[in-house]
From Swiss-Prot:
SUPFAM superfamilies attached to this UniProt entry: F-box domain
Residues that span the membrane, as ranges: none
Pfam families: PP2
Organism classification: Eukaryota, Viridiplantae, Streptophyta, Embryophyta, Tracheophyta
Disulfide bond annotation, renumbered to this chain: none
InterPro entries: F-box-like_dom_sf, PP2-like
Originating gene: PP2B5
CDD domains per UniProt: F-box_AtSKIP3-like
GO MF term set: carbohydrate binding
Organism: Arabidopsis thaliana
PANTHER family xref list: F-BOX DOMAIN-CONTAINING PROTEIN (PTHR32278), F-BOX PROTEIN PP2-B2-RELATED (PTHR32278:SF57)
Protein name: F-box protein PP2-B5
Segments forming domain F-box: 32-80
Amino acid sequence: MGQKHGVDTRGKGAEFCGCWEILTEFINGSSASFDDLPDDCLAIISSFTSTPRDAFLAALVSKSFGLQFNSDSVWEKFLPPPDYVSLLPKSRVFSSKKELYFALCDPFPNHNGKMSFRLDKASGKKCVMLSAKKLLISRVVNPKYWKWISIPESRFDEVPELLNIDSFDIRGVLNTRIISPGTHYSAYIVYTKTSHFNGFQTSPIQAGVGFQRHGMSKTFIRFDSKKRQDGWMEAKIGDFYNEGGLIGFNLIEVSVVDVARYPHMNMKSGLIIEGIEFRPKDSR
């Protein structure tokens, strides 16, 4: 390995210029490898890393990049506030900030098991799911229409199974302070079907999302077979932009409603509701 170059440390701008000169040598065909880059140059490069995806890919470039981009100093800036991290079980111990970050990418419950949280792996943005118990579901307390069950596939203790109903109406409200500001979000209803699934194929199911008292963007959805990585299915309700911090724009409303003129003529059954998820647009 050749001798490592030095970088001018008289100021941030000078450091960057010195680092850029060294990188230019590599770009122009220098025989040196990325492992020859000095530590202070690697530190400057890592300081410009803006997303977890960037850090993960950069760590694959070389051994030196791996050491730098897997360091706690890089991954700590992707972690949410301490009160968010404190939601993880106290018994869990993490050997690095990167390990802690990826633990937060798996859903974990909060609000007495009525919500779940996780981070989007690529961006570090917050994802939230409202459980069925956090939603307003028409006649869900009546055992004639809905039955609460426990299934291993669910992240929640109980989920409602639709037995038979004419009026299908699900609504929810999310405080946008618990999701990431300055982010485009999508809302999805997460569900699965039973062998008794029926009635939805011919029912006009209208879904809407929008800020409270500011109107909803509405569309029609179908409970088709689009599967998620966790085995559930989902139907997109709509998109919104969370500006963050604006008075009067802190509550998002969602709805999934059968708007048939005569819903009693088309009974519906065979649906299990996991919840409504809010996640950054185009993420999975």
